[in-house]
Amino acid sequence: MISMILLNITNSLLYILSILIAVAFLTLLERKLLGYMQHRKGPNLVGPMGLLQPIADGLKLITKEATKPTMSSPILFTLSPIMALILALTSWAPMPMPTPLTNMNLGLLFIMAMSGMFTYAILWSGWSSNSKYPLMGAMRAVAQIISYEVTLGLIIISMAILSGGYSLMLFTETQEHMWLLLSSWPLAMMWFTSTLAETNRSPFDLTEGESELVSGFNVEFSAGPFALLFLAEYTNILFMNTLSTMMFLNPGMTNPQLFTINLMTKTMILTTLFLWTRASYPRFRYDQLMHLLWKQYLPLTLAMYLLNTSTSMALCGTPPQ
């Protein structure tokens, strides 16, 4: 019994450590990629080819003094970055690699619940700073995330109808012979754009509009708390791209030994697309952002959901439960 508990704790810690290392080097990849796109080198001084830059950045942030605004709410100000990172890491629990930490029947719904909870961390961090710029950034972020969760939820339901359930292991079995991307590419395109908005990435980075809001909801955070918020943001980016790969480009279980490498290679390709988008597109206006969702994506996703449901029922094609 004790050995099983120790094994589970060790597995969880190794899982978390692997994610955090991946996130650290994702920041380096972003800086390098943006550097080359702007005809410069990017980080190249710390370690060979700048490979130790994320470690140096992390050490610098940890050793700095964390300042708190005098009029801030101290408890929420301290708790919100911790909560943000905990939620971002907890979302990975049902993800098969190829075996998940917890094989949930409703894994996708759990992920949506964690994503919804993340809005509280953002709202707390903006409100507890007791400053107008973080509060405006937090309000924008919450409005944006809640709005785009509508589309993400409808797409998840549509994909669950095609695969036969909300378990991510089912998606692996469904895509043994053919990716779901081929049969539902309009949903995949809308999903990719919605994940950009959900993770507050360019061109939907209205929460961090540098020219308007200084840095958004994390303006007043420095040192360790800022590092936690930063890690949470990039953990979410990596997670959303892993989820996209699981739902639309799943490697299947034909080669379980190569499953993780296959999955993470596709995830890195999608993440590179995120970074490429950041380098290429200007920021959307707020009204354009909302218009895109409520007047274009919502009717389309509803139509695709009804099509998938009616087709499955008409052809008796709903997979057995």
UniProtKB/Swiss-Prot annotation:
Molecular function GO terms recorded: NADH dehydrogenase (ubiquinone) activity
Keyword Translocase recorded: yes
Transmembrane segments: 9-29, 75-95, 106-126, 151-171, 177-197, 219-239, 256-276, 297-317
Protein localization: Mitochondrion inner membrane
Topology relative to the membrane: Multi-pass membrane protein
Source superkingdom: Eukaryota
Pfam families: NADHdh (PF00146)
Claim: Manganese is one of the keywords in the record: no
Keyword annotations from UniProtKB, A to Z: Electron transport, Membrane, Mitochondrion, Mitochondrion inner membrane, NAD, Respiratory chain, Translocase, Transmembrane, Transmembrane helix, Transport, Ubiquinone
Family: Belongs to the complex I subunit 1 family.
Protein name per Swiss-Prot or TrEMBL: NADH-ubiquinone oxidoreductase chain 1
Lineage of the species this protein comes from: Eukaryota, Metazoa, Chordata, Craniata, Vertebrata
Gene transcribed to yield this protein: MT-ND1
